[in-house]
């Protein structure tokens, strides 16, 4: 099926180009999204008449997208989720979650603009946001079980490193506990030995009685 593009479509073509696409792709995506028209003679003529207006509108929306991209690109957003000790999420982080995280931080992002396969592990994840057919930005989702964990991940530590540190800290606390118990036992033994080898000396009254 031939369509005429009303805007740039990635891997397909630029505005005004007539391209061949699968009928299902045209009917289910390009046409309802307003990205193309069927390439009939009437539609091609109508496009040529409106071309200048469409190009002006495209230029305006591209400038707006570029301004947003300049602020959005490189931003990091925290998403709190429950997960196992190995870092596997109980559920997933989706395009909706990414859009909501950006929106809560003050950016206008629609889930349809987010290019993302569901995230199923803790960690930092780069996510593409298509703000305009010719403009995109990359954000980072910091998926963690707590804000504290997110801050550690942001410093460059992986979930494996965090788990290893927690395990080492737990082992250290256990060792300290055993050391304290051992030290207390040694003190008790010393006190017992001292009591056994150092009997009380006779008082002056006892010496007078013997005399």
From Swiss-Prot:
GO terms for molecular function: rRNA binding; structural constituent of ribosome. InterPro entries: Ribosomal_bL9, Ribosomal_bL9/RNase_H1_N, Ribosomal_bL9_bac/chp, Ribosomal_bL9_C, Ribosomal_bL9_C_sf, Ribosomal_bL9_N, Ribosomal_bL9_N_sf. Keywords: Ribonucleoprotein, Ribosomal protein, RNA-binding, rRNA-binding. PROSITE patterns: RIBOSOMAL_L9. Residues 202-211 have a biased composition (Acidic residues). It comes from the Bacteria. Belongs to the bacterial ribosomal protein bL9 family. This is Large ribosomal subunit protein bL9. The lineage of its organism: Bacteria, Pseudomonadati, Pseudomonadota, Alphaproteobacteria, Rhodobacterales. The gene is rplI.
